[in-house]
C-alpha cells in the first residue's frame, strides 16, 4: 500500500506490519524489529508469539496524538520477523524450564545436569542478542547511507 492511499482514520489494513502502516523498511525513518523470544521467563511461556499477536491487533489502534499529529508520515516500518529466533526460543525453552523446575525443587545450580543446560540457554541468548543487533545495524546502515 502506498502512503498516499493510507488513511490513519480508516479501517486498519492487515498487511503484516505494525499498525498496518504502508512503509517499507528500506524507505522508513524508523524500523521496528521483533524479537520472538521467551526462553528465560519464569512464569508461563508465550511472549515469543507476541510479535505476530501485536502486529495483528495493532491495526485496531487509532493514530491520533495531539502532541505529534501526523507523526506516522515520518515513516515507521516493520522488519520481517526472523522466525529462526522463535524456533531457537522453543528449543531452548525446554532446557530453561527444566532448570527452573530443578531450582524450584531445591536443586543446586552447580549440578552438572543444570550447568550444561544453563550454558546452552546462555549461548542461545547471546546468539539472539547478536541477531537483533545485526538487524538493527543493517537498518541503521541503510538509513544513514541512503540518499535523502
Where are these regions (language model features)?
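N-terminal glycine-rich anion-binding loop in soluble enzyme alpha/beta folds
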Residues: 2-121
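Glycine-rich anion/phosphate-binding loops
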Residues: 129-130
